[in-house]
Amino acid sequence: MSDTPPHSSTSPVPHARRGSGALSHTLAPLAPADLPHLWLLHSDPRTFTLDTIGPLETVDQMQRVLGMWLDSHERDGFGYCAIREAGSGEFLGVAGLSAMPLGKRWVANTYVRLAPRAWGTGVATAALTTCLREVAALDTAPREAAFITALANHPARRLAERLGFTLSSESDPTESGAHVVYLLDLHDHT
């Protein structure tokens, strides 16, 4: 699935792929064992500062979300990846794409959430670039990607633009109405 070579068999992250961000990292599909790290990330209020929603309140919520993410990955052949620092294996965050309806069509929706330690390191750009290329190479994936973020989340909006997404006039698919939708033709990433 990756156009980058996997780590050696001694990698602490099975099926890992090297990233190219300023902070050297690996990507690997999420697994049930990632639950403790995902819970710490998604319960940290700092990682939700610019979102219209707040952090998760219970580990059970994170377990249900992780179950949905794993099911989606199994069903669609693509999904979210754990991002770990190369060498140390420290969990830095999660990034990837998942299929979702947008209007009357299906798109590959972009997701990224990083631990504060990884902010501003280039990891989000590098991880999502890799994920976009991998999804674009799949015959069964949607041909369009979406990046939906809070209107006031300027760092995420800049990230979308760095990745080549274009601000669209698409209606906010969330209940809050406080989001913008960026779109990207995945044919451009093959």
Predicted segments, located by residue:
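Acyl-donor (CoA/ACP) binding surface of acyl/acetyltransferases
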Residues: M1-L50, Y80, R84-T190
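Conserved GNAT-fold acetyl-CoA-binding loop/helix
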Residues: R46-M68, G79
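Short, P/G- and charge-enriched loop/turn segments at secondary-structure junctions
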Residues: M68-L70, S169-E170
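Short loop/turn motifs at secondary-structure junctions and domain boundaries
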Residues: D71-D76
